Amino acid sequence: MAKLLSFSDESRGALEKGVNNLANALKVTIGPKGRNVVIEKKFGAPDIVNDGVTIAKEIDLEDPFENIGAKLIEQVASKTKEKAGDGTTTATVLAQFMVQEGLRNTAAGASPIELRRGMEKAVAQIVDDLKKKSKSVSGDAIKQVATVSAGGDEEIGSMIADAIDKVSFDGVITVEESKSLATELDITEGMAFDRGYSSPYFVTDEDRLICEFENPSILITDKKISSIADLIPVLETVQKNGTPLIILAEEVEGEALATLVVNKNRGVLQVAAVRAPSFGERRKAALGDIAVLTGGTLISEDKAMSLEKVQISDLGQARRVTITKDSTTIVANEAQNTELSNRIASIKRELEETDSEYDQEKLNERIAKLAGGVAVIKVGAPTETELKNRKLRIEDALNATRAAIEEGIVAGGGTTLLELSEGLGDLAKKLEGDQKTGVEIIKRALTAPTKQIAINAGFNGDVVVSDIKRLGKGFNAQTGEYEDLLEAGILDASKVIRLALQDAVSIASLLITTEVVIADKPEPPSAPGAEGGDPMGGMGGMGGMGGMGGMGGMGMPGMM
């Protein structure tokens, strides 16, 4: 494919336009009085969302160079979301300011390399100062962090605090859509472990990069599966029943994995493969725990059991299974209480008999996973559009709460960044030239989130920042009052603030040191009637896998 090249100020100018287009769409959502963004969908009703990363993923700009700038800022939002679960809009607002100021100074003759060094030194100091300022989470702080992250919704804050209280900080909390209008908290049997899908092609929700099935069957085995022939009987059974299948095995690889992926993508099967947790004998124990939890049978080599002879009664059942790239959560049905109690009692007897501290730790972990249960927040709303928006808010609030538990809390509303910016004056005095300018860029950038929160609430951002410095108090955008935000319960998770700042400066420093941009040359519009050719042609490439196992000849006419 032919490429387009852009150089120097022209290239940086195009990148900046892309950054501004995306950032301007995102920053209207920040703060308790942030606005919504309406996103048109090809099919169905439009989405109305308040979630930064969801908005960012929907934006594609016509100009290829501007689109690269937009995608770099989308990367800021996505990285912050992935690592902290919240703070995407804060990261975007910071990155936009840093890019604008950095490019303005570069155009005036500043060295982009020296600017970057100064910016990185400033951020390193802010991160150190942030750690010193953080306070551990206690009392009502959990509810307050969740409430702030949910856009001031106290019902959500209370529900998340209640969920953590019931399943502990280390417990599993999931969010699902309710069939009623009410949002409810349900505690049920379940388990989570740190293994994800065997292939990203099993993803069913591309926005969240997860694979999620309702009421799936679960094949549980300690075997390594490489031949599709081993799976044909069970695949035929679940295909006839229309039931999703989760294959939990030591490894699914080669021909078996490729065939499952192709049939899943063609819509023939609802299937996903997951690597079994732990190693060696502990893996068998963990799989045994999952078998008891789901009412299934562990198909084990030790018992001389064969995958070809698996019956539907050997498969485990779950209410819901959610799989990410590195974790799996099983929400169990409620029919296994007796077997579960017996399993826990058996593990406790093992615990009493062992003297090894390591074994005791692992056995206690197994008990906690089986006994702790899963807190399920069932989200209800009058319309599907509101339901999606509310679900995103709850997920953000839950992620922010977990981040607060990890690294502590600070005053919210952008106030902490504003306070920490004052400490950069001493650092700037120690530096000179463009490095000093880089520090000053970060100092000014740290005021940007507070300004935008104030603007979204209908106030003058510059006046609010000036008043905060003069009064020594934070700005409560919900009430329009100046007060101690820690006492008022307006809190941010330190981890969210730290990652937003680090991710923002990472992308901004790359952008201001860019000299050449290379983009794909847009293809001319297709002739009328030819539009369907390319997509179908691309699918045809998968047909080459049809010889992989010859499933049609093995009793699976509907597959491959």
UniProtKB/Swiss-Prot annotation:
SUPFAM superfamilies: GroEL apical domain-like, GroEL equatorial domain-like, GroEL-intermediate domain like. Residues 520-542 are annotated as: Disordered. Transmembrane segments: none annotated. Signal peptide: none annotated. One of its GO terms (molecular function) is ATP binding. Pfam families: Cpn60_TCP1. The keyword Nucleotide-binding applies. GO terms for cellular component: cytoplasm. Its EC number is 5.6.1.7. It catalyses: ATP + H2O + a folded polypeptide = ADP + phosphate + an unfolded polypeptide. Residues 530-542 have a biased composition (Gly residues). ATP binds at T29, I30, G31, P32, D86, G87, T88, T89, T90, G413, D492. Keywords: ATP-binding, Chaperone, Cytoplasm, Isomerase, Nucleotide-binding. GO terms for biological process: protein refolding. It is found in: Cytoplasm. PROSITE patterns: CHAPERONINS_CPN60. Together with its co-chaperonin GroES, plays an essential role in assisting protein folding. The GroEL-GroES system forms a nano-cage that allows encapsulation of the non-native substrate proteins and provides a physical environment optimized to promote and accelerate protein folding. NCBIfam families: GroEL, PRK00013.1, PRK12849.1, PRK12850.1, PRK12851.1. Forms a cylinder of 14 subunits composed of two heptameric rings stacked back-to-back. Interacts with the co-chaperonin GroES. Belongs to the chaperonin (HSP60) family. This is Chaperonin GroEL 2.
